[in-house]
Amino acid sequence: MDKVKIIEAKESLLADNDRDADRLREEMKQQGTYYVNLMSSPGSGKTSSLKQIIARMKDRFRIGVMEADIDSDVDARTIAASGVDAIQIHTGGMCHLDADMSRQGLSAIGSEKLDLVFLENVGNLVCPAEFDTGADLNVVILSVPEGDDKPLKYPLMFEKADAVLINKIDAMECFDFSLDQVKANIHLRKPSVPVFPVSAAAGEGFEAFCSWLSGQIQKQKEGTRQS
C-alpha cells in the first residue's frame, strides 16, 4: 500500500500569515498609521464602544474604521455616521481576517491618509485570535452578560490581548458577574494586560482607555523618529 503524504497545512498557513503580518506592521509604522484590531463575541459592544472611542479621539487623530462581517453593511453605516471614514469587508463566510485581507482593507480605506485605523473583526472568540492581522494592538472586548469565566474558556484570545475592555458594567447588578474575578481570570492568561471597565451605553470609562491608547500611539511615533 502506498504511503500517504501528510501536509501540515495549518502550521504553514499560519507561518506565512505571520510573516506577512510583520511586513504589514512595519509598513504601517513607516507610513505613520497606527492599526488596532478589536475582537470579541457577537453582541459584546464593539461598534457601540468604537463610537465612544471615536467621539473622544477624532479631534486629535484622522481615524478610519474597517468593519468585518460575513455579510451586511450595518456596522459600517453606523460608524460612518460618527464622522469618520468607514468601509465594510465581507469575509466570504470566513470567521476571521488575516494579514492579506487586512492589507486589502487598509488599501481600500486609504490608510496612508489616516493616523489611526480600527479593525472591527468578525464576532468570535476563537478564530480571530489565531490569525495575526498586522495590527499594532489587539484589544479584546468582553461584556458582563457573557460571564466572568470567558478568559478561562477561551485562553488564546486573552493571551493575545494587549488591552481588555469590560463592557456593559452598568448591567452588573443583573448578572452573576464579579469584576475582581474577571480581572483575576484575565491576568491568569496575561498578567500585564491592562483592563478597562466601561459602559458604551452610558459612555463611562472610555477616557482612561483613550488616554492609554493615545500614549501607545505616541510611543510608536517617538520610536519611529529615533530609529
Feature roles, as predicted:
Residues K3-E26, Q31-M39, S44, S48, ...:
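Nucleotide-state-sensitive switch-loop elements of NTP-binding domains
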Residues L14, E112-L119, D162-D170, L213-E222:
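Short secondary-structure transition/capping segments
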Residues P128-A135, V144-S192:
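Conserved C-terminal guanine-recognition region of P-loop GTPase G domains, centered on the G4
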